[in-house]
Amino acid sequence: MKLVALVVLAACGGSQPATTSGPAAPTRDQGLVAFETVRTVLQHPRCQNCHPSGDAPLQGDDSHPHQQNVQRGPEGRGMVGMECTTCHGPANPSSKYGEHIPPGSPDGWHMPGPDMKLVFVGKPPHELCEQIKDPARNGGKDLHALRVHLDSPLVAWGWDPGFGRAPVPVARQAFLDAWETWAKAGTPCP
């Protein structure tokens, strides 16, 4: 009789482990809300100043053209004799130096190269979204490579820009969480 009971239980699936699914993927609407947070960060002066439509970086909270006629150069690191790292060192200077001192980053100050400018300035949300997720227009990066880029010291600088500069208005973790939500929702564009 015990054998019959075991066979019946096995046939009913009683011996199968219960299956659990992980959290549901975010909806398209949740992805769109998350992208608005991403867009807010990317189009803040801390980010867009190095992602202009032209070949000269912008500077300041008002995104004015960079002084000294600084140019992108052949690799996005400035022109010969006027590379970005000529003035921008490996760290932010002490606040005791006052305002308007060139900020720094340990992975070297630079812009995207001229062949892949990745423009953030003036892009409507839909165009910005499509550009970001298109490897043909974003430096050849897939979503994973873009996410890795978000952890670079130069990107993180936006939240610690040094004395006299406004940081990105969205908390860094909130931005990263929004990026993940947008990605998991399938990178929908507005």
Regions found by a protein language model. Name each.
Residues 1-7:
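Sec-dependent signal peptide recognition
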Residues 22-41, 57, 61-76:
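Electrostatic cytochrome c docking/interface patches
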Residues 4, 42, 78-82:
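Flanking scaffold residues of small Cys/His-coordinated metal-binding clusters
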